[in-house]
Amino acid sequence: MPELPEVQAVVNHYKPVFLKQKIERISNPNSYSKVFATHTLPKLNKNVGGQLIKDVFRRGKYIVLQTEKGYLCIHLRMTGQLQESLDSFVADKHCSFAIHLNKGKTIYFKDYRKFGRLYYYSTLDTLNACLLYTSDAADEF
């Protein structure tokens, strides 16, 4: 699992790529549906399609894309990576989702072990509660 500085490096790299772009849609090249933790792909596209990305930041080990109506949260887990291009083998087999932006730009989520997840929340309250719960539980040990 990436450490916080590695997740922050991903945020720093992709913030200029995502910022002020509109999400056209999200696709699922390898048909692995468990990557979508909170919503099905059609419902996710209904929530984020056409939304402008207003900010990109890190919350814990989550990469958060703030849209006009909610938050798209990416957790890399063990082997997840965001990439701007993929060869066809990886796209077919290891690309769990792709975020299609306006102007023809696509960001791919490559995950060999399929542990990474994509979440959508209308507010950050649920994500914040999860992060507080896990850090509180860790303090007990």
How would you describe each model-predicted region?
Residues 1-68, 89-91, 100-105:
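Extended, highly charged segments
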Residues 68, 72-135:
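Phosphate/anion-contacting hairpin/loop surfaces
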Residues 136-141:
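A short, hydrophobic C-terminal helix/tail in secreted or cell-surface proteins
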